[in-house]
Amino acid sequence: MGFITKAIPLALAAMSVVNGAEILETRAGVQTLADKYIVIMNDGVTEKAFDSHRSWVNRTHRRRLVRRGAKAMGGMKHTYKFPTGMKGYSGHFDEDMINQIAKHSDVKYIERDARVQINAITEQDNVPSWGLARVGSREAGGSTYYYDSTAGEGSTAYIIDTGTDIEHEEFEGRATWGSNFVDDMDMDCNGHGTHVSGTVGGATFGVAKKSNIVAVKVLDCNGSGSNSGVIMGMEWATNDAKKKGADKAVANMSLGGAFSQASNDAAAAIANGGVFLAVAAGNDNVDAANSSPASEPSICTVAASTEQDGKADFSNFGQVVDVYAPGDSITSAKPGGGSQVLSGTSMATPHVAGLAAYFIGLGMPGGPGLCDTIKQKAIDAIANPGAGTTGKLINNGSGK
């Protein structure tokens, strides 16, 4: 699930109904994970009913293995419980078992789990970043970042990505490890997540230089993971933010793929939980309405601009885009120290998450409504933004 150059799609072409529950069908070419599924429960299913359903699934799965000699499968793997009420689980089931689950009256729909992948491009090291200067200026071509000294102090940014090098000098001890849903290595062995984190809250490269960074790892060293694993990270971040104060929290997902109802529903659950969420529009130069979670309307969807205030040639576009942000040749932190340059809507998105954290530091109300604040303060700057797309470029309101 990554937007730097190209992403393996998680497309859902059509819905079929199997005795009541929708089983979402994947398009040709999607790299699904064999016999692995995401099950989402009906709205309003109680904790008691959910517990009963999961017990039934576990019992039925075990009986199939023992009594029927069914193909060995892992069964239920992870349970999703968002504070806003969204419930579900992922698991490893054969076709007969998943059809039994689909018949259960408490099940809303089922998606095949799918593999996701990022592909980063490193251009060069140790060059100045133009993105920060653009966020703090009403005119292109500046070299100074103007910002209020509060700099996002008191805010927390959840970076749902490949992890973050929390020891990097950019973070000055403000970065912590949250949780890991992809492997047993609590480190960023890819570099994408550290770069994103640096743009949000790095001392040199960050929009909100005093914000706290929390690493939520959902992609491995190759930038690869699963849709179910990403949703696990989304759930964890939402629940952790609720404990610490959702109104002071922002989340960044420089991830995505083709349309996924489960991904969109999880993104909506983050927003409904009171957490601002910035998501990459995608890098295929197509309408982002076909991308997830970018197409979820309750979040802030970000397209990428160039240093000359043009639409980056790779950036997705369309009515679902809320705002543009710098995303072409952006310098930020890399694991182990120093910096690197990356391009993509992945790089544009943390400028927006960082700006949300910056506004929280100024005392503005947090939550998904911050996207409206960001749009109100944005400037009309993007030439040829794409059909039906806003030309608004983010600005921190410094007045410079």
From Swiss-Prot:
Residues 129-400 form the Peptidase S8 domain. Pfam families: Inhibitor_I9, Peptidase_S8. One of its GO terms (biological process) is proteolysis. Residues 1-20 form the signal peptide. It is found in: Secreted. Residues 21-119 form a propeptide. SUPFAM superfamilies: Protease propeptides/inhibitors, Subtilisin-like. GO terms for cellular component: extracellular region. Its EC number is 3.4.21.-. The keyword Secreted applies. PROSITE patterns: SUBTILASE (PS51892), SUBTILASE_HIS (PS00137), SUBTILASE_SER (PS00138). Glycans are attached at N222, N252, N396. The active site is at D161 (charge relay system), H192 (charge relay system), S346 (charge relay system). Residues 36-118 form the Inhibitor I9 domain. GO terms for molecular function: serine-type endopeptidase activity. Keywords: Glycoprotein, Hydrolase, Protease, Secreted, Serine protease, Signal, Virulence, Zymogen. Its main location: secreted. The keyword Magnesium does not apply. Belongs to the peptidase S8 family. Secreted subtilisin-like serine protease with keratinolytic activity that contributes to pathogenicity. This is Subtilisin-like protease 7. It comes from Arthroderma otae (strain ATCC MYA-4605 / CBS 113480). The gene is SUB7.
